[in-house]
Amino acid sequence: MSTPARKRLMRDFKRLQQDPPAGISGAPHDNNITLWNAVIFGPDDTPWDGGTFKLTLQFTEDYPNKPPTVRFVSRMFHPNIYADGSICLDILQNQWSPIYDVAAILTSIQSLLCDPNPNSPANSEAARMYSENKREYNRKVREVVEQSWTAD
């Protein structure tokens, strides 16, 4: 990996340790700074409350000029999360900017949990349910939250 990307990832990690956003944690693998594990805790007073959701972030030597590949490892039910865990979020695609760091990425994903974009669905069933039957959508989200407690 190129030195600028490595330096930036070390800086991102240091910032995340020193000033972690609420409900978010993340760290690189022991021997690989380009592969990170992260956890997002479901925001309080939302259907996601109490959930512990695992993600991976894979960076390339083009970071921070190109976004990482981010995927949920935890099973999710959300309009903007594909079955394979990949996330439909503008800052991870066409709205990416080098000013975003790991903390900003994870915070944006945490915000997306509670504020999905049903007009850009990755999961059409979840998007339809979110728009047409919020009670049933919230029930499915609670199932995912409960599964997050026992998942590896």
Swiss-Prot record:
Positions annotated as active site in the UniProt record: 88 (glycyl thioester intermediate)
A GO term for molecular function: ATP binding
Keyword Protease appears in the UniProt entry: no
EC numbers, comma separated: 2.3.2.23
Entry-linked Gene3D superfamilies: Ubiquitin Conjugating Enzyme
Catalytic activity: S-ubiquitinyl-[E1 ubiquitin-activating enzyme]-L-cysteine + [E2 ubiquitin-conjugating enzyme]-L-cysteine = [E1 ubiquitin-activating enzyme]-L-cysteine + S-ubiquitinyl-[E2 ubiquitin-conjugating enzyme]-L-cysteine
Pfam families on file: UQ_con
Keywords: ATP-binding, Nucleotide-binding, Transferase, Ubl conjugation pathway
Top-level taxon of the source organism: Eukaryota
Domain UBC core: residue ranges: 4-150
UniProt entry tagged with the keyword Nucleotide-binding: yes
GO BP: DNA repair; proteasome-mediated ubiquitin-dependent protein catabolic process; protein polyubiquitination
Pathway given in the UniProt record: Protein modification; protein ubiquitination
Family: Belongs to the ubiquitin-conjugating enzyme family.
Function noted in UniProt: Catalyzes the covalent attachment of ubiquitin to other proteins.
Protein name as annotated: Ubiquitin-conjugating enzyme E2 2
The species this protein was found in: Triticum aestivum (Wheat)
